[in-house]
Amino acid sequence: MASLNQEQLKILEQTRQRLLHLTQSLGSLSNSINQSDPLPPWSSLQSQATIISNNLLSISHLLTEHQELLSSIVAYPTPNFPGRTESTILHQLMRTKLEPRVEEWVARGRNVARHNTASSQIRAQQGAAAEGETVRLSVDELLDLWHWAPIAANMEARRRDWGGDYTLEEKEMGVKNVITGLKRQLDEGDEEDEEEEEEEEDMQGEEMEVVVGAHTKAGGGSGVEFDIARGSSHIPSKPVAPGMPLDDIFRFMMTGAPPRPR
């Protein structure tokens, strides 16, 4: 390939600048999340995400517009290139294949784009054929949906913590090292059972009157008198002392003076 002209060099420089802006935006978002405690406000994160989205859109338009030029450019070192001191950059420039992780991302993105393009064409054809009717998924699309949905739902469920006292990260670090876990929701039914048991005990402890005998009234009067005896398990309640006035309580709290006898 012949040497690049000024217009082609300008396109390469624009691509480099926009990739640099994207790298800086991603680094800024990563630092704000990792170093801020507490996390930045939602408006700040949303603003940074919007900037990253605009950078990605700009790079996508630039790569699509100059796809022919960028795909035909070949990098090669000149004799003056410092290959020994800049070997890392040289290997990156001479690399002909993407990294495995990046290659997987590209394949996934192309698959999604291909599927969306095919679905859009099918919907457009169906809309042109029957305008106003509800667009339904095809058999292949339904099969793909039913194959994808349970796997995606299972993966999403595993990434979340469904009702434990501690999060997955806290369990991995060790529960003993956790200062405060998630608050457990107590069952109100336990409190109601305890109140019912206390009421039954109080009823059993209440005094019971028992008729133990009967005799005629003293003095020769007409009628019958009954002898009433209390249950053997009855325990007389202790008299309750009167409550302390609030004035004495506040005076003791402020000055330490003991309450006045009553």
Swiss-Prot record:
Bias-annotated ranges (Acidic residues): 188-206
Regions annotated as coiled coil: 168-211
An MF annotation (GO) of this entry: RNA polymerase II cis-regulatory region sequence-specific DNA binding
Keyword entries, A-Z: Activator, Coiled coil, Nucleus, Transcription, Transcription regulation
Keyword flag Transcription: yes
Entry's Gene Ontology BP terms: regulation of transcription by RNA polymerase II
Family membership noted in the UniProt record: Belongs to the Mediator complex subunit 8 family.
Cellular compartments per GO CC: core mediator complex; mediator complex
Chain intervals for the UniProt region annotation (Disordered): 183-206
Name by which UniProt lists this protein: Mediator of RNA polymerase II transcription subunit 8
Self-association and partners: Component of the Mediator complex.
Localization, UniProt: Nucleus
Its job: Component of the Mediator complex, a coactivator involved in the regulated transcription of nearly all RNA polymerase II-dependent genes. Mediator functions as a bridge to convey information from gene-specific regulatory proteins to the basal RNA polymerase II transcription machinery. Mediator is recruited to promoters by direct interactions with regulatory proteins and serves as a scaffold for the assembly of a functional preinitiation complex with RNA polymerase II and the general transcription factors.
InterPro entries cross-referenced by the UniProt entry: Mediatior_Med8_fun/met
